[in-house]
Amino acid sequence: MTLAFGEWIIHRRWYAGRTRELASVEPAAVTALGGGLDHVLLDVAYTDGSTERYQVLVQWESEPVDGYGEAALIGTASGPDGTRVAYDALFNPEAAGRLLSLINRSETIGELTFSREPDVTLPVDAPAKVSGAEQSNTSVIFGKDAMLKVFRRVTPGVNPDIELNRVLARAGNPHVATLLGAFETSSCALGMVTAFAANSAEGWDMATASVHDLFANEVGGDFADESRRLGAAVASVHATLADTLGTSVTQFPIDTVLERLRSATRAAPELAPYAPQIEQRFRRLADQPIRVHRIHGDLHLGQVLRTPESWLLIDFEGEPGQPLEERRRPDSPLRDVAGVLRSFEYAAYQQVVTGGGDPQMADRARSWVDRNVDAFCAGYAAVAGEDPRASGDVLAAYELDKAVYEAAYEARFRPSWLPIPMRSIQRLVS
């Protein structure tokens, strides 16, 4: 295979190597799936010595095809049969359907194993369309029934998104999209199929619309009832994971949060005046026993969907950028709770920041946040039997840890939003 993948991959939204200098991109494994469709694993090397593996499905055509779109064009390659054009196959409905059919038939081709979950049938004849919503993976929607998520950056080991969705679905938890199938090699997961949440709305969009309505008039859109339902859904998922996979007790992760604080302070010097107080808050918990079990790991309002029936939690892959073993490590459910509480603050205050920081808007944003935090925690407590705020200092520490991470991110990539986490840090350490 002589395709110049390097020039193509650096422009993909899911490519994670933008901060490093690319050294080489080479096919590590190519598996023919029939009909001009190749499954390709790419080894990407960087000049700093680090490496990553990416997954691409290549559809070969004898001549250019307009229907794919510019983003799908990988390049051309010459061979005994002449020059052929290569496209990202997920943008081809027929090729995507062929992949779904392999999963539906639970086939094995070379090193690739396709498997369908028991007692389900996949909509192999449904029209396929690539979703534009994701950054790190690529999803294809089949009609109104199923969604195929293809992992772009693949890592050896058990994929937590497949693992936890399977556990929750088989336990009958109603707050996840049912896992329908998957495909993998002997060493790594490559993709999964879940039931598609048709007619759903993302929690972030609903929350920011509520805040926008609030700023537009005194009555505003009220999100508190939905926050209460969301709290109950999160508690339900936590309970199922704890009951199914077990719990244990460990110490508060003092070394991890202190290292994150040091790293973030280098990236965001604005943290420096607060660093001693933050460190003191963390160190007070150094010997604190923490109940842990498997959790979502990267929960926020962009990771939840409101369907006509209920809230669904999606994308159980864990915190982006963390090693797989860290993403699968049991953690406190308060980390997920803190992620949602931080998301409430972002939903409210990002409109204050973009609106020029008007004090009256800030006061109304604070009221909106407080109302939705109260509702979420009440919904959580109704299922879990305890309000997460009863853990006081521990919950605040997880919120601080998240806000410290956010401050470093905003300082690097979105400085105009840095006041959002800084405002929260000031409040939490006071």
Curated annotation (Swiss-Prot):
A GO BP annotation: trehalose biosynthetic process
Keywords for the protein's UniProt record, in alphabetical order: ATP-binding, Carbohydrate metabolism, Glycogen biosynthesis, Glycogen metabolism, Kinase, Nucleotide-binding, Transferase
Recorded superkingdom: Bacteria
UniProt GO molecular function: ATP binding; kinase activity
EC number: 2.7.1.175
UniProt enzyme class: transferase
Pfam families: Mak_N_cap (PF18085)
Pathway(s) served: Glycan biosynthesis; glycogen biosynthesis
Reaction it catalyzes: D-maltose + ATP = alpha-maltose 1-phosphate + ADP + H(+)
Functional description taken from the UniProt entry: Catalyzes the ATP-dependent phosphorylation of maltose to maltose 1-phosphate. Is involved in a branched alpha-glucan biosynthetic pathway from trehalose, together with TreS, GlgE and GlgB.
Quaternary structure (record): Monomer.
Family that this chain belongs to: Belongs to the aminoglycoside phosphotransferase family.
Protein's name according to its UniProt entry: Maltokinase
Species whose genome carries this gene: Mycolicibacterium gilvum (strain DSM 45189 / LMG 24558 / Spyr1) (Mycobacterium gilvum)
Gene: mak
